[in-house]
Amino acid sequence: MRVIKLGGSLESAKTLLHCLNRIEQQYRNQKVVIVTGGGVFAEQVRIAQQHWQFNDECAHAMALLAMQQMARLVKGLKVDVELAHSVRAIQQSQSHIIVWSPDIDELNNAGIPATWDITSDSLAAWLANVLSADELLVIKSAVIDDTLSLAQLAERGIIDKAFCECVANSVFTVRVINQQCL
């Protein structure tokens, strides 16, 4: 099984549909779980938090709702994908392409901290670990220098601050690529 994290900025870069088409073509005979970033919806959470000054716990829950909205968007664009709201639903699915719509309670029960240091990047790593995935492929709109380590990508803000810790003891392969390399 492969977990593919689609950066939220792919939506605003207008390449989301292209990436979904490429995933369908390239992984036709493999089980794939798509994790979406929150995109423009998550940006609105950041703006609202700055304006209203609510705590990170509230922002975290709202950012997860943003990921759910993006998952619904993917389902709207690709009606054949299955929308799964839990790890168990993913594990039981017979579908070939699944898009994860994260459940707030499931993540809270797993002890995922409510902080902007943990974004959909780290949540994709958490999911890949829980599912015992073979690979975590993180697709970004940013230009990726493939000579940089994960720590260097985190320093540059390409992946979130907690990502390296989330994949530190993982047995799956981790790749971070630009959308053009898909």
Language-model-detected regions and their locations in the chain:
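Nucleotide/pyrophosphate-binding catalytic subdomain
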Residues: M1-C181
